[in-house]
Every structure is written in structure tokens, then in C-alpha cells.
Amino acid sequence: QADIFIRGGSFDQTMVLLNGIDFTDARTGHQSHSLPVDIDCISAVDLLDGVPGVGAFAGAVNIRTAPLKPTYLRFEGAGGQHGYAYANLSGAVTSGRFSLLAAGSYRRSDGYRHNTEFANYNAFVRATYEAPRAGFFDLQAGYQNRAFGSNGFYAAYNPEQCEHTLTALASLRWLQSVGRF
């Protein structure tokens, strides 16, 4: 878990965008960075200057996703001490004007001390289509399930603290040029 601070502003003053769509958590910016996208699906991270909208007093971060290659299928796995395990399945298909990127992952650990365990599930899909006359369509959807112990994070006298967050997001964007504009 981490917070984003830009130019002295807090996480509540920083907008988080995924492929240009605002997914800032309206309840608390503390969870805004918890997007259901694995690092190998990220093609770039842009730091946007100025104030692109409400909730972006300090600035904005745009996370862009793109396939690693036009067409691929990839499985990745890892393991380590304290019961650490990681598995990721991702792939993409690109054909002409259509592109599909999909990924799912699981990451867990028993923790390095009492009540520092975690289990994270991510699923993300993005499909784009450039229609000759109808315009550009961009659909993305994701789901995340995170549970983790936070031993002493909120109060040192209570080591039995934990958090569990569920995130579901989706967007459909349509871009169409009109006339010569």
C-alpha cells in the first residue's frame, strides 16, 4: 500500500487516471492507486501538470496500458520465503483495427511477522476498435480483491488490524471526429 503525493499535495488532491479515464476513489484517495492492473500491462505512467479536473489540485497521474506485443500469451510464476507465491496469465490479440489485452494474477504471502499476510487477486481486460466511419471505441474493465494484515499500522497497541478492499471498474469511451475537426 502506498500513497501518491505530487508537489506537496496529498493523495486526496491527486487524480488517478487509467488510460485517460478518472478512477480516483471518491471516498478516499488513500485507495486510488489500487487499480486492478499488473505491472506488465503498463506501458507508461504520465505525470500531468496543471489541474485537469476536480480532485486534481496537486496534479494527476495517468497510467497507460498496452500489450507487450501485438499477439502473445504469457504465464509467469514465482515463489519465495514466508509462503510467497505469484502467478500471472496475460495475453493479447491484435488484428487489423481490433486489439484485446487481458490479464489475471494472484499474489500471496504469510507475512514476515504476525498479521502481515496478504492475498491479492487482479483481473483486467481492455478492447479497442477503430471503425472506419463510426469512430474509436475503447472498453476496459477490471476487478481486484485485496486482503492484508496491517499489524500496528493504525495503532501500535493493536496488532490485529487488517484491511479488505474490493474494486470493480469499467469504462467505455467513444471518440468520433466531426467534419474537419
Task: Name each model-derived stretch.
Residues 1, 32, 58, 84-86, ...:
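Transmembrane beta-barrel architecture of outer-membrane proteins
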Residues 109-116, 130, 134-181:
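Flexible loop and strand-edge segments within Gram-negative outer membrane beta-barrel domains
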Residues 15, 44-48, 60-66, 72-81, ...:
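Predominantly transmembrane beta-strands of Gram-negative outer membrane beta-barrel pores used
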Residues 1, 11-13, 40-42, 56-60, ...:
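Extracytoplasmic
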